[in-house]
């Protein structure tokens, strides 16, 4: 009597999935391309500003004008999106984090500049208040400020 457990080869042999290059590309398990990447960017106030991030070798904080210049290479490489992380000066922070919804805030200006220069580039922004507040806790008292 035939027993499937006694077989020494796989029960499923999907050769048809490997017959042509296009089908192999469609069914392969892992494929990492530029389409899978999001480029994180730390944005600074000012013009022509570039600061290295000491804890992350090779990473820099950029002012909006330099960010727009650098984004040209990202678009050319086919990277579909950037994630903006604003580095807000302490003088612009407050208890309510009002810079988060200020239409002239750093993240908002960077988003507009990138979309004006590269409409096809996705721009992802963080909704956290920590870059905009003087403390990490938001309370009802802060809303009255």
Residues covered by each model-derived region:
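Short acidic, glycine/serine/threonine-rich loops at helix termini
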Residues: 94-97, 133-137
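Alpha-helix-loop-beta-strand connector modules within alpha/beta enzyme cores
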Residues: 96-125
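Short amphipathic alpha-helices and their capping/turn segments at secondary-structure boundaries
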Residues: 22-32, 68-78, 108-119
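Glycine-rich, proline-tolerant flexible connector loops at the mouths of alpha/beta enzymes
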Residues: 51-59, 81-104
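An N-cap/entry alpha-helix motif that binds or orients negatively charged groups
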Residues: 2-65
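Conserved small/polar residues in nucleotide/adenosyl-binding loops
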Residues: 138-143
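Active-site beta-loop-alpha junctions enriched in small/polar residues
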Residues: 44, 87-89, 128-134
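Hydrophobic faces of well-ordered beta-strands that scaffold small-molecule active sites
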Residues: 37-40, 82-84, 123-125
């Amino acid at each position: 009597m035939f027993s499937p457990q006694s077989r020494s080869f796989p029960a499923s042999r999907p050769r048809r999935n490997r017959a042509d290059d296009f089908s192999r590309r469609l069914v392969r398990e892992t494929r990492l391309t530029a389409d899978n990447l999001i480029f994180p960017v730390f944005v600074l106030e000012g013009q022509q500003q570039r600061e290295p991030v000491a804890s992350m070798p090779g990473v820099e904080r950029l002012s909006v004008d330099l960010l727009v210049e650098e984004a040209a290479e990202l678009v050319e490489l086919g990277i579909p999106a950037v994630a903006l992380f604003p580095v807000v000066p302490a003088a612009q922070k407050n208890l309510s984090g009002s810079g988060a919804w200020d239409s002239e805030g750093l993240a908002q200006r960077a988003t507009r500049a990138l979309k004006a220069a590269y409409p096809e580039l996705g721009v992802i922004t963080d909704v956290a208040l920590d870059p905009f507040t003087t403390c990490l806790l938001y309370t009802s008292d802060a809303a009255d400020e």
